[in-house]
Amino acid sequence: MTDRDRHATITKDELMARLSSVGAYKTGVAAVRPVPDDVMNHYNEWLKRGCHAGMTYLENHLEIRRNPELLLPGAKSIICCAFNYYTPPSDSGTPEKPVGNQLKWACYALGDDYHEAIRERLSKVTSWLTETCGHECRICVDTAPIFERYWAVQAGLGFIGLNRQLIIPGAGSRFFLAEILTTLPLEADSPCTLSCGSCHRCLNHCPGHALNTQTSKLEIQNSKLCLDARKCLSYLTIEHRGDLPDGVKLGSHIYGCDECQDICPHNCNSPATTITEFTPRPEILKLTTADILAMDRHTFSTLFCHSAIKRTKLAGLLRNATYITQLTHIN
């Protein structure tokens, strides 16, 4: 008898209940297997076209992306989780509906850093799972080389929209995705087979036209849309280093962009998050371009210490504020 045999067994329902208790809005399970060739071919073509812009790390670990078992030898199941980060609009304004000259921040970034918050919550579940049944686990929160949205579809959480976001039917796309790879064999859920249908609102609403570059009707029908990061305001304001390309118009987008989500009809009735860590911080919402342009490294580090906004670094935030200020003066 092995150590694993001496441990108690748990049911899938018990595991899903545990995940719900730590804040997961929706969960599902997919069996670990290599990613199909057509998915890998589409991804490699996207890389070949340079649509990943300066995110060269996306070129790494292709074999691991193809076969998630390389992340955890012996893995049998991928437990996919969606965590709601959305806070509805209020009279004082939000990132989606700012008041006056309020800057636009990506909604997901206004609370605590989701990497830290979600990993801490999921660790409670993986510790319980390992102690209870002796199986190994690995938590992935947006940093491991794994096709998160593909596996979320396979686990039945939702479908990938034309804006390349995972859309949960009846709830929308304002969710963080995370996974638990485990050696515990679990019954897989049925993949989600829904699509955007005839709705193309996001394609024309994208301010940088990043969603409809070289897109054929067949690609739209097959949801093989190519998002060109070189034109995406989220990439340009967060990941891009150095000066912004000529012709970029940020408007009031200081960090990220939610335009393709705001226009999506699936987000009309997005539920409010119950996770306190994702509540928008007032000290961030009230920032002006003048406040940002006056920031030094200490102020930046203190304000964004436990925030995803630190990703852009002080230089990136100063650059964005400068561009917005210059555009305001021109207009």
What does each of the following model-derived ranges do?
Residues I10, E14, E120, K124, ...:
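Generic recognition of stable, solvent-exposed alpha-helical segments in well-folded globular domains
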Residues S21, R201-S216, K224-S234, H240-R241, ...:
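Iron-sulfur cluster-binding cysteine motifs and their immediate structural context
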Residues Y235, G242, D246-N331:
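Alpha-helical scaffold domains
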Residues T193-S198, P207:
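Long, well-ordered alpha-helical scaffolding segments within enzyme catalytic domains
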Residues M1-T9, S90-V99, T213-L225, Q326-N331:
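Short, basic, low-complexity termini and linkers enriched in Ser/Thr/Gly/Pro
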Residues L166-P191, C226-D246, D296-S301:
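Short, charged low-complexity linear segments at domain edges
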Residues T2-S195:
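Auxiliary alpha/beta "docking" domains used to position bulky ligands
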Residues V22, W128, T132, H205, ...:
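Short alpha-helical functional segments enriched in proximate histidine and acidic residues
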